[in-house]
Amino acid sequence: MKIIWERIDNWLAANAPQVLKSLRPGANDEELHRAEVFFGVEFPEDFKLSYRVHNGQDEESYSLFPNLEFLSIQSAIEISEKWQNCSDDNFRCDGDDIFEGIWNGWWKPNWIPFTNESNGACECVDLAPAAGGNVGQVIIVEWQEPTRGLIAPNFRVYLETFADALERGEYRFSEDGYGLVDLVDFEILMQKHN
């Protein structure tokens, strides 16, 4: 995980130093243990190793992941509490919104959010998948819609895929886009200024 973060940090240093500056120092063992106690699970080793490098990013900073704040461990706890407090036992996804391997409900206490969008969507490490899913898979959970989707089979693949995309030039920094944006969004933002 350190090597993956070195790749990301190097790209940020050259292309988006504002984002690099917003990344927090790594979490310590006590912070990680406290979060594991809160969530009632042991985090996957890659997830812990990643958070030992960077414990999220400063709030109100340019986004690392497009349109998503990279959450600190403490913020992950707070987001999870918010979702749990708004729990709807009758909520169910239907039709195209059902994905095999992802629990069909509002919120699972063993979903560990690590990103958050201003509209409430978040990406989570799923430590309680439904039948056909993989423990540690990365999912998207939408606040305003009954949408749950699979993003990556695990956190390492998620982060490595992001590093690969950065190095291929698939993202740009945009002050108007509040941080890193993909090339399609970047072109739309640039058209607004022309």
Short names for language-model regions:
Residues 159-194:
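Long, compositionally biased interface segments
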Residues 57, 120, 131, 144, ...:
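Short loop/turn segments at secondary-structure transitions that flank enzyme active sites
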Residues 72-75, 126, 154:
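Helix N-cap / beta->alpha transition motif
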Residues 1-118, 173, 188-194:
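A surface-exposed partner-binding patch
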Residues 53, 115-117, 128, 141-143, ...:
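Structured loops at beta-to-helix junctions and adjacent beta-edge loops in soluble globular domains
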Residues 101, 105-108, 132, 149-152:
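Short, amphipathic alpha-helical segments
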Residues 123-143:
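Low-complexity, glycine/alanine/valine/leucine- and proline-rich hydrophobic stretches
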Residues 140-166:
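A recognition module on extended beta-rich or small alphabeta surfaces enriched in W/G with H and D/E
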